[in-house]
UniProtKB/Swiss-Prot annotation:
PANTHER family membership: ENOLASE
Name of the protein described by the UniProt record: Enolase
Gene that this sequence comes from: eno
Described purpose of this protein according to its UniProt entry: Catalyzes the reversible conversion of 2-phosphoglycerate (2-PG) into phosphoenolpyruvate (PEP). It is essential for the degradation of carbohydrates via glycolysis.
Pathway as given in its UniProt record: Carbohydrate degradation; glycolysis; pyruvate from D-glyceraldehyde 3-phosphate: step 4/5
Length: 432
């Protein structure tokens, strides 16, 4: 048989920002190995599952993860040994039981997720399947429309731009490989435009440029210029997607949004809604993530009522990949899409449940990386397995981001003639 778990190993490794993270090896009785490493975020939702850090300031500035590693070796491994790696749900449930907290603060979501993903990898390897085939079965044939981060601002950079991510989406591409080519061409064109304007072309955490632009609007203007100069039509071939991460701008005391990196302007919730409505009229924006702060549910409702039938409105900090928050959003008719970050919730089973709930309610789902990544490519397989049709995994630079795109290119090749790329049609929450 050989598919039972023989042993689980774990170690502290380094992520793309030089911070420690957890890697786990699940070894089966027949010697099959499944290995996975977990990511971590810079801007985090307050309701996210807890990433266990050691807190010893003299080691890695307190960011060590040896406690999480020990929890895998001393608590999780002895309990999972002998269990079938082919029963992902049972494995994940067992870890949730062992943890016993609502936010995984005892064992750490980073410990639990590493084992959850490594188990799926071991099971797939044992069966001679690719991870996307194992998790998605015969239905896994949709390649995602990528959200490629090309300009960074806010908490991801040191410039005068308030909004965290300006992305492009190649909605007019015919295949995934075309989508990557088009995005790379715009990325390189943007680099030369920024260079000619005298801006720096160094890249941020997620591989996008972080030039010291004069305003938020200028970021959209240079992207439009790059799309056109690369030979594409904005809004038809390539659309703009934003992640302003407004929870980082929101002052809960005054209930105002403070443009702290640029004009120092303060906007009420209603004014922020009007601001986005104007931008959607002015630029070919197809998606806005976290357009309102995570605690501003009223603002979210106003935003959804105002432009939710025109563009994709993604809840990230709002939902933190959690079915209880998503349920509230669905009931209140707030947002129309959810960002799926495996480490926000902590197991593959719960991730599948969140996507299932979103799809049933007519919400779109976008599988996402974090700003602190590794060479692990599980999310590339996951997006195909889940069939969500959208992925957000950074820019067309930095190996930690490119690893995911390259894995998707391999999957597209393997699928051959049954591979599908839906482009603009993935936006079923607005394509009504």
């Amino acid at each position: 048989m050989g598919f039972h778990i023989y042993e689980i190993k774990a170690r502290q490794i380094i992520d793309s920002r030089g911070n420690p993270t957890v890697e786990a090896d699940v070894i089966l009785e027949d010697g099959t190995l499944g290995r996975a490493a977990v990511p971590s975020g810079a801007s985090t939702g307050t309701n996210e599952a807890v990433e266990l850090r050691d807190g010893d300031k003299s080691v890695y500035m307190g960011k060590g993860v040896l406690k999480a590693v020990e929890n895998i070796i001393n608590i999780i491994s002895p309990e999972l040994e002998g269990m079938s790696a082919l029963n992902q749900v049972e494995i994940d449930r067992k870890m949730l039981e062992l943890d016993g907290t609502p936010n995984k603060s005892k064992l750490g979501a980073n410990a639990i997720l590493a084992v959850s993903m490594a188990t799926a990898r071991a099971a797939a390897e044992h069966l001679g399947l690719k991870v996307y085939q194992y998790l998605g079965t015969y239905k896994a044939n949709i390649l995602p429309t990528p959200m490629c981060n090309i300009i960074n601002g806010g908490a991801h950079s040191d410039n005068s731009v308030d909004f965290q991510e300006f992305m492009i989406m190649p909605i007019g591409a015919k295949t995934f490989s075309d989508a990557i080519r088009m995005s790379a061409e715009v990325f390189h064109t943007l680099k030369s435009i920024l260079s000619k304007k005298g801006y720096a072309t160094s890249v941020g955490d997620e591989g996008g440029f972080a030039p010291n632009l004069k305003s938020n609007e200028e970021a959209c203007e240079v992207i439009m210029e790059a799309i056109k100069s690369a030979g594409y039509t904005p809004g038809t071939d390539i659309a703009i997607a934003l992640d302003p991460a407004t929870s980082e701008l929101y002052d809960p005391k005054t209930k105002k949004y403070v443009f702290k990196w640029s004009t120092k302007e303060e906007l009420t919730s209603q004014e922020m809604v009007e601001y986005w409505a104007k931008w959607v009229e002015k630029y070919p924006i197809i998606s806005i993530e976290d357009g309102m702060a995570e605690e501003d549910w009223d603002g979210w409702k106003k935003l959804t009522d105002k432009i939710g039938n025109k563009i994709q409105l993604v809840g990230d900090d709002l939902f933190v990949t959690n079915t209880s928050f998503l349920k509230k959003g669905i009931e209140m008719k707030v947002a129309n899409a959810i960002l799926i970050k495996v480490n926000q919730i902590g197991t593959l089973t719960e991730t599948f449940e969140a996507v299932e709930m979103a799809k049933k309610a007519g919400y779109t789902a976008i599988v996402s990386h974090r700003s602190g990544e590794t060479e692990d490519t599980t999310i590339a397989d996951l997006v195909v397995a889940l069939g969500t049709g959208q992925i957000k995994t950074g820019s067309l630079s930095r190996t930690d981001r490119i690893a995911k795109y390259n894995q998707l290119l391999r999957i597209e090749e393997e699928l051959g003639s049954i591979a599908e790329y839906h482009g603009k049609d993935v936006f079923y929450s607005i394509n009504k």
